[in-house]
Amino acid sequence: RLKLNIRLSGNVADRHEPSTPGALDLSGVTSIIQQAVRYPGLTPTYMSNGSLGLGPKLQGTPISWAECASFYRTDDNRFKANAELAYTPLKGLTLKCVGGYHYGASNNYDYRCNMILGDGRGTGPSSLTEQMTSTVYKTFQLLANYNIQIKKHDIMALAGYAWEDERSRNLSGYRNKFPSDETPYLDAGGADGQLNGGGGYDWAMQSLFGRIVYNYDQRYLFETTARYDGSSRFPTGNKYAFFPSVAVGWRVSEESFWKSAPSLHFFSNLKLRASHGVLGNNNIGNYPYQSVYKLGSK
């Protein structure tokens, strides 16, 4: 009568790839590969004295870019936990409690070194852009489902409550002019020209809902549903709304007059259905009712 299901999953990813040096309009290992097939084959990466070649644009060559201290790194961590507890106190009645927790965090680092070429010039000031994002999603449901069959009558009733919540935060920072490629950390860069930013969002929704389905002899169908939903994405006074619906159906192919007419048997299952209801939609921005919504300082 009592059943518990738990599902756990996680993912840890650490991606590290070369990137281009400072002041170049290109970035990432894909750009390095693309430029490598376009550069003249006789362009030297190293001079006879071991220093880096200038390249046709005085910015080095794709090979020297791939070997320099620039890098792009992504640390991504994901965790999901879902649990379902089901209880059947009597025949036809099932009670369920469902919950879920999802966590995700991502850190991105884009470091561009100042690569020194053979004539002593640098490609541009070193710089670091760092971005951090974390998101937490939670959900909870209570469900009661009842099924009963009395001769030719089939009845199904469902009632439930649902709640979900998501919160996300992000933070970014930028600095340049690092004294050494051995310390690619924001606090090691120069304070002049530094940039920072951040943001986030929150949303939540809760619902009460129910449904009744009646079926007589697999021929006549009746269904009614009702929802009372509330969303944080709407302003005070308009957060909650009621959404009813009703539907009727007639499976004509189960009638005796249909089955007794061989000329109609090319329709193995013919059902007529009519429905009417009210729908809602909260797939909008998180703060559309705010004329101004800005985080920061002057």
Positions of the model-derived regions?
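Surface-exposed loop/interface segments of Gram-negative outer-membrane beta-barrel transport/assembly proteins
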Residues: 2-78, 96-206, 233, 254-298
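Membrane-embedded beta-strands of outer-membrane beta-barrel proteins
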Residues: 81-83, 142-144, 157, 210, ...
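Residue-level signature of outer-membrane beta-barrel architecture
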Residues: 85-87, 146-148, 214-216, 224, ...
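Structured alpha-helical segments in the cores of large, soluble enzyme domains
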Residues: 206-216
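Transmembrane beta-strand segments that form the barrel wall of outer-membrane beta-barrel proteins
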Residues: 222-231, 274
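Solvent-exposed loop/turn segments connecting transmembrane beta-strands
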Residues: 232-238
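Outer-membrane beta-barrel domain signature, especially the mid-to-C-terminal portions
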Residues: 237, 243-245
